[in-house]
Amino acid sequence: MSVKVFIDGSSGTTGLRIADRLAARPEIELLSISAEGRKDVNERASVINSADLAFLCLPDAASREVMPLLRPDVKVLDTSTAFRTDPAWDYGFPELKGQKEKIQNSCRVAVPGCYASGFISIARPLVELGLAPVDYPFSCTGLSGYSGGGKKMIAEYESPDRPAHSKIDAPKSYGLTLGHKHLPEMQKISGLAHTPAFVPVVCDYYSGMQVLVPLDLKLAGTTAGQVAEGIAAYYKDGATVSVHALNEPLPENGLYSNALSGSDRMELYLTVNAAGDQMMLISLFDNLGKGSSGAAVQCMNLMLDLNETEGLE
């Protein structure tokens, strides 16, 4: 027996990726809507209400507009920022403590933001395990492929009219007033007393993400060994998250941000300096995989009582 699934917003980057993943799965029946119907919130709601599960791959306002029209028992996965800090919604990161069970029993799941996924994968266990205090002054830097900017940015970077040498050849930092839209979920889901200082950087490659979080071990009141042991134990049963050993030799003496492009896995790297008082914790993944459509499909599998990693790469 097939499961009826509808993707509201199937023409965007995330929606297209989800549709491609589900099209090859015989147990999934993808529902459709006319071009005219996509512009009618009541028509969209009608199709969603006929589904077993729906993905909302929409701007925040469009997601908020349709939600009051939906049956409470329809399973909904929202990929916007609209509901990620809403207490009525469950956060779609199954590897966090207790989160898998919540997602399995939920009708409302908010898919994490890409940068937020990387930061939370590090900060949440540090705070939860008492390896850093809730008021620790966290900071992080995130590097992303240009697909994270959606269709408009993809078109800019891949334009046939792009000059041989242009400013977008170089990495671009942005959000420099420290107000990125992922910050509320980064703080709340990690359990922090203060908003972290976060700077994102977009780079000239299609997909892949690296989030780097420095840790002052004296200020945190812990040791590198305790951090490595704690994080490894935290994710030991994680379906898509793995942890490398402390100071494991890095491939090519560093990490390329696009190393996991095309994958739905997340890999955490932990390094410590010679003095043993500073660490760098790095989350490596694909912004379109664990940072977006891969996480959404993983949550769908759990909500529909399917194999958690079915359809993942």
Regions found by a protein language model. Give the residues of each.
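Residue-level signal for short, function-critical loop segments
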Residues: C114, L219, N287
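C-terminal substrate-binding/catalytic lobe of Rossmann-fold NAD(P)-dependent oxidoreductases
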Residues: S11-A45, P137, T141-G142, Y146-L281
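Short, hydrophobic/amphipathic alpha-helical packing segments
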Residues: A116-A123, G179, S293, V297
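N-terminal Rossmann-like NAD(P) cofactor-binding subdomain of oxidoreductases
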Residues: M1-Y174, V272-A274, E310-L312
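Active-site catalytic microenvironments for nucleophilic, acid-base chemistry
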Residues: P125-L129, D216, C299-L306
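PAPS/PAP-binding and catalytic site of the sulfotransferase fold
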Residues: V109, V227-G230, A296
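C-terminal helical cap and adjacent loop that interface with cofactors, partners, or active-site loops
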Residues: S257-E313
